[in-house]
Each structure stands twice: as C-alpha cells, then as structure tokens.
Amino acid sequence: MDQNLKIYSILEKNSVSRETCIEFEHFISMIIENNKKINLISRGDEQNIRERHIIDCAQAFDFIDLNSNICIDLGSGNGMPGIILAIMMKNMELPIKFNLYEKSYHKSKFLESVSKKLNLNT
C-alpha cells in the first residue's frame, strides 16, 4: 500500500492528503472488482490505473471553479474524473456537489454504489 501511495506524490501541489490517497485506493479496488462484469477500464490498464487514470483525472482539479457549488461530469462511465474530483473535494472539505450523468444502467449503479461507500457529495 505504501508503494502505491508514493505514486501520488505528484499531486502534492493540490494538497492531496494521505486520506485522499487511501480513498483513491478504495475506488481502484471497486473498479477492478466490477471491471470483469461491466468493463469499466481496459484489462491492460488495471496494472497502471494510478498513473494512467487517477493522477490524470486529479490534475483536472486546477480547472474547477471553487466558487461554484456544482460540477458536472457528463458520460461519467467509470467515474473518472467525477469520482476522483469528488474524493478530493470531500477531503478538502469543499462543498461542491458533483452531478454524474451516465446512460448505462449498470455503470450508473456502479457510480451510486461508489458514491455511497465513499460518502461522496454526488
């Protein structure tokens, strides 16, 4: 686990806490667990999900208007970037709600489950 947390050091400029990184890891385990059933990411990306998906999505934080109270993720699919950014906002105690829109029933249910398990403002 500690080795995985070191990968997130690139996000220090965004004040990403250890707790946030641990929640990223919980999210990753949910993606991998559900990936076999609903194809959330390519099988090849499971090994490098942190670098290829999580860190990329977290860098979008710089483009969010922190004075807004809503952020929208259209075509949320596997929850990236919406879930990643919602995790960051929660741990920074910023009151921005993330509206996640996904047309696939199974992916929508996955997003609902993740949001509840991680207690996100979505």
Model-derived features: positions:
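Conserved SAM/SAH cofactor-binding pocket of Class I
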Residues: 58-122
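Class I SAM-dependent transferase core
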Residues: 2-66, 106-107, 113-118
